[in-house]
UniProtKB/Swiss-Prot annotation:
Function (record text): Component of the ERMES/MDM complex, which serves as a molecular tether to connect the endoplasmic reticulum and mitochondria. Components of this complex are involved in the control of mitochondrial shape and protein biogenesis and may function in phospholipid exchange. mdm10 is involved in the late assembly steps of the general translocase of the mitochondrial outer membrane (TOM complex). Functions in the tom40-specific route of the assembly of outer membrane beta-barrel proteins, including the association of tom40 with the receptor tom22 and small TOM proteins.
Renumbered residue ranges of the record's region Disordered: 429-455
Membrane topology per record: Multi-pass membrane protein
Stated family: Belongs to the MDM10 family.
Name this protein carries in UniProt: Mitochondrial distribution and morphology protein 10
Subunit structure and binding partners: Component of the ER-mitochondria encounter structure (ERMES) or MDM complex, composed of mmm1, mdm10, mdm12 and mdm34. Associates with the mitochondrial outer membrane sorting assembly machinery SAM(core) complex.
GO biological process, one term: mitochondrial genome maintenance
PANTHER family: MITOCHONDRIAL DISTRIBUTION AND MORPHOLOGY PROTEIN 10
GO terms for cellular component: ERMES complex; SAM complex
Domain notes: Lacks alpha-helical transmembrane segments, suggesting that it resides in the membrane via beta-sheet conformations similar to those predicted for other outer membrane proteins and porin.
Chief location: mitochondrion
Amino acid sequence: MLDFMDYIQLAFAEATNWNRDNSYSSLTATAQSLLDFSTPERLRVHLSSLATPHFATSYTLGTVGLIDGSVSYLYSTVPLNNTPSRSALIPLRKLARGYRQVQPPVAPVEDCGWQSCLGGLGSSESKPSGNDDSQPSLGRKATLLNATLHLPPPTILNALFLRRMSPTMQLSLAVCSTRGAPLSNSAPQASLLGQLSHDTGKYSNEYLFSTDNSLFGWRGLWNFGPDPRHPKENSSPQLSLLSAGAEAYYSPVSSLIGMSTGLRFSTLPAATEMPSSSSSASSTTTTSNHGTPISTFPYTLTLVLTPLTGSLSTTYSLRASPNLAFSSRFGFNVYSWESEMVAGCELWRKRRKPSPPPVDDDGLEWARRKMRMADTPAFAPVEPPTTHNRDEENESVLKIRVDQSWNVRLLWEGRVKELLVSAGVGLGPSSFSSPSRAANSTPAGGGQSVGGGISGRSYWHGVGVSISYSS
């Protein structure tokens, strides 16, 4: 489940119309949400608040074995007036990221001045009249500041500076500083990661630099198909999207080189929607069955290749129903002939709001219905049937993940009253011990442990609960 500060950063990106999915780093985001989720290992309590549309705070306390915590503050020049902050009102699908439906590329807004577009978001209702000087010059460009202090020692400070330079460019600076032990006289270790992103809708580029080993990096993504900056009139909606990308890193200090390339094919929302009468009439020449959607369910396929290490990874994710999604990943190394296979799924559970209690029947209800039917006009308007979607809400989600070594992860995330709760457990052979070490540590008698596995290898990776409340 996303932290409250990550949720506010996501709301900031949506408020400034920045597409976080149009990036090479998000190429396999759908499979990672279903397969690489983490489970809490201890008891943690989060208290957060969006005190004003511009300022948010968050406090975290962890216990069981080791007591630690963190304090986080966030400031945004863009008012987040329409962002629900109460834990009872935040949509659960915003926090528990599952199958991510890829959206068609969108061109940046360049018709009006970008300063007025970004600086005036949400300010038309909240800015009082006659107070034009209340908005500082920094607010002309959408800016976000976030700082998190982790306690106790060794104290770690994480800071983030995010600023929109133009409708197509965004600058991000992340700082991580670690203070040593109390008796240590060494200076705090710090590193800076800078990232400049350029997104046009058709393609995106990211330029990175890290002070850690003076690392330079580049990431790029190209979307095949029509250019959203030059839309055509009377064009049919795009049904699928094919994207290709690559990344490269180089460090002159450590002579480190890294690169990878990947492909992604995904269906778009128009592929699973029922076409309208006008669009179906125009598509009679291309398909004979225009009354049905092109695809019965959304799906995403990815292929990632790392040439230097010889690694090949493929993923296939699909959403079988609005409440059920599956994903699988197969990895293979051409040098070591090692393989990896992971499968996972998520199941959403909806809670239907209780219907009002029925009126006590005194035996004459049939007569009252007869009288109402007699008084009803012959051509009275028929009320549309009520759907259960508006009477239902997402209550919880269950995620399951298993690999070829029978390492199993179970994660339950849901809402209990006004609290957001995450509970997870990890089962299976310990991944920290190699087979040879496990064989050497096994007694000669080959005894079994209490959990049914080989002694010396833990079958419980961790059990934890995380409780969050925000206002």
